[in-house]
Every structure is written in structure tokens, then in C-alpha cells.
Amino acid sequence: MAISTTKPSLLPPVPQRLFSRHDLIPPRQDVLWRIERGAVRTVTWSEQGTLITLGYWGMGDLVGQPLSRVVPYQIECLTSVETSIVPPELWHQTIDSMLSHIQQSEELLSIIHRKPVSLRLWQFLVWLAEKFGRDVDQGRLIDLGVTHQEMAEVINTTRVSVTRMLQQFEEQGMLLRHQRRLILCLPIQRFRM
């Protein structure tokens, strides 16, 4: 982990920190973390130890304990991540990012209540494609490695069910696999929420 000071686009100079894949970003009460590069997920777990995914966050998003009342609360790096520390005196300058945080949380909440589970998985893939994807010749590449287990945790099903549904989507021509990534093959407009 390295610390440096740089100047993000709209904020005065703030300390930056680098984290490696699988690192945990400290959930401090006194700062928010702006994701400058990379992707993280926020999680908690139930009394029985079941992992509960709260959100997936990427470039420009804010995360941090001050945005959540959930305890326990953990920020896990899914890739190498560069963050800026945003202290409370600068929070008023982050309203757009905070609104985006709320909107994304509500989008995920609506996805996890979809039925049947296959629709829930498909809508989650669409959401990932919109947030972390890029256009390629075959469709929209989800440029984030999300495991079948991680997908299962988000949509509240089993890893085996996710694997089976992904195979069905592939057989139906809805997605392709490319170097451990997924490509959604239908035009994005056809399967938006």
C-alpha cells in the first residue's frame, strides 16, 4: 500500500492510497473513499455467517462506513484499486457521487427481488455490463472478473444454480465467454430494466 498526494478533478489535493486485489479498505468513520481506478464490493454477513453483498463500485464511486449503517461493513478490492481519501470537510463537494451511490444501491435492491432467479441473474449481468462493461464486436463485455460464487451471493442463490443458468444463457446465444469474462450478446436496449 502506497500513499501519495495528487489533485483529483474537482477537489483540492487529497491523500491517495493504492490497494491490491483482495485487500480490505479500512472502513473508517472519518472519511469516504473515492474509487479513482479499479473495482470494489461492499459486504456484510448475517448472524449465521452468510455473506451479503451490499454493492459493486467502480471509478468515481464513493464508499465508506459513513454511507452505511450496516454492521459489520467491509470494503473488498476486486482488482487493484486506487482511492482518494475524502475527509468530512469536502463531503459537500461530493453530492453527485452520493446520489449515484443511492441510485446504484436501489438498482441492486430491485434486481435481487426479481423472480424467477434466472431473470435476477440476467438483470444483474446487465447491470454489471452497464457499470463495468465496454462494447466489443459481439456485444457488451463485462470487464470485471466476477466468480459464479460472487454472483450467487448477490442474487441469493447457489453457485451451482448460477453455473447452470449461465450455461443456459450461453446455449440460447445470450452470452459468450471470453478469457474468463462474459460478453452479453443482445443489444443493451433489449434487456434493460
Residue ranges and their predicted role:
Residues W33, I75, M174-L175:
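A structural signal for short hydrophobic beta-strand segments in well-ordered beta-sheet cores
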Residues P15-L24, S46-V63:
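Short acidic-glycine-tyrosine-enriched beta hairpin
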Residues D96-T157:
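Polybasic "coupling" helices that flank or enter modular domains
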Residues F132-M193:
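Phosphate-/nucleic-acid-contacting segments
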Residues I52-E107:
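Cyclic-nucleotide recognition modules
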Residues Q29-W45, G58-G60:
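Glycine- and acidic-residue-biased ligand/ion/polar-headgroup-sensing regions
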